[in-house]
Amino acid sequence: MKQTLLTILFALLTISAMAQIKSEASETVELMGILSRTAGFQEFSNDLAGQYSKDTEAWFAQYREHPTVTYYKELRAKNGIAYDRVTNMAVHLEIEKGKVKLVGNRAELTGGWQNVDLDDFVKRLNKFYADTRFHEFFEQHRTFYNDFLKQYDTNVMPYIHTDWYGKFYNGTGSDEHFRIIIGFTYGSTNNGASRQLPGQPLEVFAVCGYNLNPQTGRLLFDTSLPLHEFNHSFVNPLMEKAENEKAMQEVGQRLFQLSQSAM
């Protein structure tokens, strides 16, 4: 009887821990997404957010020639800053007392960022943030963000379970802190990212785009997207190791043979 009660208690604690994961809106994710949209990055220009997309265009269109936007376009051309690299920067930013600052390990900013003067980038980003009155825009849409997050938590979060990641990839329990952020400018773009703050568990992010079908007016609630994006934080480091290249090629070829008829 005692063992049964302990088992039930453990199950309840596990469910409670999983229930603590809630979707979020992030000012830095919106900042990088809207900067990318203003710079004409096609992956952030889907405009699948209905009135929010219209509000974004009305507010930021006048800043398409802003010095930071011009500089950012150059970074894309020279360093390939796009897609998940935008998101990787976003999760390594925080806003404190009205200023954007870098946090975490700068060595985690790869994929082109390692060739960028990060202090200079943040300085330019702060100018865009101030000149566009970005915080004012973000706060004006706080109710919109929160209303959607409630819907997302109802429709998606009951299906999100993260305890298996550590067991599957490391053979141990998951110590990571999993977070789901909605990118309201991302549309059909979805990315995974991670960061390690000093003295904190590894934070694993799934940044999922707000996707409103323009034909039906229905919101997309895809329960598989966060799970897919979380995987990147575990799979990508394995792929980057040279000693794994041959093994992955062999497995990839076998998997392709099994699935090529459906592709």
PLM ranges: what are they?
Residues A130, G166, N170, N231-N236:
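Sec-exported extracytoplasmic/periplasmic mature domains
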Residues V69-W164:
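Long, mid-chain structured domain cores
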Residues K101-G112, N190-L220:
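Active-site scaffold of zinc-dependent metalloenzymes
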Residues L220-N244:
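Active-site recognition of the HExxH zinc-binding catalytic motif
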Residues M1-K22:
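Bacterial Sec-dependent N-terminal signal peptides
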Residues Q20-V100, M263:
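N-terminal mature-domain "stem" immediately C-terminal to a signal peptide or N-terminal signal-anchor/transmembrane
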Residues R142-P201:
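Auxiliary, metal-adjacent structural segments of Zn-dependent hydrolase domains
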Residues P237-S261:
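Post-HEXXH active-site segment of zinc metalloproteases
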